[in-house]
Amino acid sequence: MHFSDQDRFFMESAMELAKESFLKDEVPVGAVVVKENKIIGSGRNTVIADNDVSSHAEINALRSASKELNNFRLNGCSIYVTLEPCHMCAKAIVDARLDMLVFAAKEPKTGSICSIDNFLENKALNHSVKYKFGLSEDISANLLKDFFKQKR
């Protein structure tokens, strides 16, 4: 897949947020929402800190972007995430009407884009989101491996 210099920049921004999560003892996932080549929202996993199962990086980034635009619809936006979204996050991405999803590493246990499901390919969805993956995949996968190695 082709990735632009802008894609690399935005994924690196998401990766920095994932590293913050790692340091805060949260699963290291980060996400940024971009509109017109500007980051308008960012988030990292805060499930433990918030005692909230929905506080995934993607959800936090969508909330941040929605506040910035004062609109829950994020048409014309893209989201960069360090890990393949789960079903909850994939549905939120569709409902927010994002144009593009770029993610780094596949998530073989819960990834709903191309690992356990092809959620975005579902013709019944009322909005279509393009996606591509693999940018900084090794960096994300290694960060996750290191995190879970610490836990054992």
Where is each model-derived feature located?
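Short beta-strand scaffold segments in enzyme catalytic cores
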Residues: 29-37
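Helix-adjacent hinge/juxtasegments
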Residues: 51-55, 59-92
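Residues that line or immediately flank small-molecule/substrate-binding pockets and catalytic motifs
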Residues: 47, 81, 105
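Short, basic and Ser/Thr-rich N-terminal targeting/leader segments
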Residues: 25-29, 75
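Small-residue (primarily alanine) positions within well-ordered alpha-helices
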Residues: 14, 18-21, 31, 41, ...
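Zinc-dependent deaminase
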Residues: 1-24, 72, 85-152
